[in-house]
A protein has these predicted regions:
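Extreme N-terminal starter segment of soluble prokaryotic enzymes
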Residues: 2-5
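C-terminal "cap" of GNAT-fold acetyltransferases
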Residues: 85-89, 123-126, 130-137, 141-169
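Acetyl-CoA-dependent GNAT
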Residues: 8-14, 22-31, 38-99, 110-112, ...
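Active-site acidic-Proline motif in GNAT/NAT acetyltransferases
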Residues: 97-99, 103, 131-132
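Amphipathic alpha-helical recognition patches that constitute DNA-binding helices
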Residues: 16, 90, 104, 108, ...
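Conserved acetyl-CoA-binding loop-helix of GNAT-fold acetyltransferases
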Residues: 102-115, 138-142
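Short coil/turn segments at alpha/beta junctions that flank glycine-rich nucleotide-binding fingerprints
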Residues: 103, 120-123
Length: 169
């Protein structure tokens, strides 16, 4: 694989980010999240949300051959995961172009985020994954995470169980 570049997101990246997110959901969550939800994901709605995220810290992309092939959102606080005590940072989202999975892109994005947190002296990172998403759970376990909690994830008025992976940095 040619050289992968990890960099901060630009406004021009957002349509590619949204495309990866929507197709990622449809590929990874089929059989986990109801089909009617997956089949009606609104890219414009997702784009508006990503535009709001754009100015925040912790929004990176993986670029290969001048094309966005993955992205991450992360925060160096515990505002999103107050149900787990002692957390001081969180990986909010990690997505890879579905046709390019198992090429090390997710690992490089993950490690970039961990290095960022370590440089800020963060100690305990959490990320949430749908409980029935076995491939992602396997990846997050391989990356050193331990399941420490469970909560419900709400989408379009329906609830799905998520598990929280803890990483001691």
């Amino acid at each position: 694989m040619e050289e992968l570049i990890i960099r901060n997101v630009t406004f021009q990246d957002l349509p590619q980010v949204v495309d990866i997110q929507v197709r990622g959901w449809q590929a990874a969550y089929r059989g986990i999240i109801d089909d009617d939800i997956l089949d009606t994901l609104d890219k414009n709605e997702k784009l508006e949300k990503r535009k709001k995220d754009f100015d925040s810290n912790g929004f990176i992309v993986a670029e290969l051959k001048n094309k966005v092939v993955g992205f991450c959102r992360y925060v160096d606080n515990d505002k999103h995961s107050i149900i787990v005590p002692g957390i001081d940072c969180e990986l909010l989202a990690l997505y890879v172009e579905p046709t390019l999975k198992h090429n090390g892109i997710g690992t490089k994005l993950f490690n970039y985020v961990v290095d960022e947190f370590k440089s800020k002296n963060k100690k305990s990172m959490i990320l949430w994954c749908l409980k029935d998403n076995e491939p992602s759970k396997k990846f997050y376990t391989k990356m050193g995470g331990t399941i420490v909690s469970q909560k419900m994830f709400e989408v379009k008025g329906r609830s799905y169980p998520e598990v929280g992976f803890l990483y001691e940095l």
